[in-house]
């Protein structure tokens, strides 16, 4: 009698052939052949026509053993068990929810295979192992039905009305896939209207991923929550988290203070946590007028000792603007989690005019965006960062390769307000020098001016807003590079009396002394230097070719302070001298500069990966700039900044 399969969709079904027994006297079912034709051309060849069947079977048997897999088998078995359940066949236990007397006959083996809870119940020697009817206290009727339906069908329907019952049941019975589905459902459905409730559910059932998402959602949309009043329903812990976060967007500190006061006054017991919440408001970033008109007029801000001290802190901070970089704390920091590569100044390739542009690079949009420009154009200047304040020191406002137009002025940029102020000037005008920030001080090393090359070193103290001289170098240097590591400053290479150097010097501010270290393997000047981990990298620059011309130095190396030893690394892709350099996410970015081999300013930005020892060209400046400088700053997100036009930067001529 021929074999028959009842099927309406052959493409779904795949049957393992080895179970088929046939002979020349037993014709194959046309239905089976049809299935094979649609599923496996190789089997079709093996089965062949009845006339050539034996030879084909022999050739198949002669080959290696084959394993066949049915993609539909598991779903067929699952459907079979579900039908048995619906028909009440072979069920060996009845489950009852804790809130009703409803009864649900099921198969122990199915429940145990899907749940560690039921596996332990039915195989661990518990009394329920022998019971025919089990009451599940803590599981509702709705939740139990959802769990049973999922185990037998692999499908789960959810809405906000059934979600909590389903979560309780899945958590109680340890049905992990259902928990995952509930997480996805919650995250995908978060809105301004329900985010507080979703957060409560996440906290109740320890849904960490959902809780993190709600935090992120509230941070991103807190300004909108303020306008709707939904923030008043937030629990203390989540509100405190929001107020302390650097990721909070589009809210002023005054907005946050007023909102917190509203939240506190909604219920009397909330006033007990007033001081804890106010510690997260950044009062030093408010204006004096805001503090006087809106903050000091609130009763508990005048009576609670903690709140009074917060106001005193803000007042003292604002009274000492020059000291602010060394007074930084969580309450004085910019409320942003965005750190960007920043460039400033430089001399333009064609017109030889000097830029005063301050830009940051947005890696998401691959665009340069403008921040407040400097008060005066600069190139060959020194830059350094203390407490996320950017200092721009000395340099030149006019294009002059001899340094005769060096300046002594110093400016400081505050990214919190996108503003510049002028601070104390250098004792000597300097250009082609190095500037480092070390232990809360600035050190301006060497350089040149109209009087010639400089061996002197000046130190700026933000606490007194003064520059003072410290120990000078043994010889004058300009075009050198420097970096800091381990509480000391290192200076490499440069030019002394028109001779390129390869020496490495170390300055210890505690002893006010210079010491010599192992020299570089290559002489170079107008190069750059930076620190990554415990390595001091020296990159690019140029040196003499013969007696009157210059060559790019493509070779690079790093210095180990522990070993007092230099090691070569991969060479640059293209020569760059007189550049900006910054370390961002443990990668070294070399920005702009001048190529002596090509005799032109360059716009290229090259990135070096210390782990892979590889160089890559990553992006370009909006224009070719030599004598440019670079660093990293924490700034407000790029979407809140102004896009920088490619060829229309604010430049100032000589």
Curated annotation (Swiss-Prot):
- In which pathway is this protein known to take part? Protein modification; protein ubiquitination
Q: Name one GO molecular function term.
A: ubiquitin-protein transferase activity
Q: Which UniProt keywords apply?
A: Cell cycle, Cell division, Kelch repeat, Mitosis, Repeat, Ubl conjugation pathway
> Which positions fall inside the BACK domain?
195-296
PROSITE patterns to which the protein is assigned, alphabetical: BTB (PS50097)
Pfam families in the cross-refs: BACK, BTB, Kelch_1, Kelch_KLHDC2_KLHL20_DRC7
Do the record's keywords include Manganese?
Answer: no
Q: Which InterPro entries match?
A: BACK (IPR011705), BTB-kelch_protein (IPR017096), BTB/POZ_dom (IPR000210), Kelch-typ_b-propeller (IPR015915), Kelch_1 (IPR006652), SKP1/BTB/POZ_sf (IPR011333)
Annotated BTB domain ranges read 91-160
| Gene Ontology, cellular component aspect | Cul3-RING ubiquitin ligase complex
For this protein, the record's SMART domains field holds:
BACK (SM00875), BTB (SM00225), Kelch (SM00612)
Domain of life of the source: Eukaryota
**Where does each Kelch repeat begin and end?**
340-388, 389-440, 441-487, 489-534, 536-586, 587-635
| Gene Ontology biological process terms from the UniProt entry | cell division; protein ubiquitination; regulation of cytokinesis
Please give the subunit comment from the record.
Component of the BCR(KLHL9-KLHL13) E3 ubiquitin ligase complex, at least composed of CUL3, KLHL9, KLHL13 and RBX1. Interacts with AURKB.
Q: What does this protein do?
A: Substrate-specific adapter of a BCR (BTB-CUL3-RBX1) E3 ubiquitin-protein ligase complex required for mitotic progression and cytokinesis. The BCR(KLHL9-KLHL13) E3 ubiquitin ligase complex mediates the ubiquitination of AURKB and controls the dynamic behavior of AURKB on mitotic chromosomes and thereby coordinates faithful mitotic progression and completion of cytokinesis.
What is the protein's given name? Kelch-like protein 13
Q: Which organism is it from?
A: Mus musculus (Mouse)
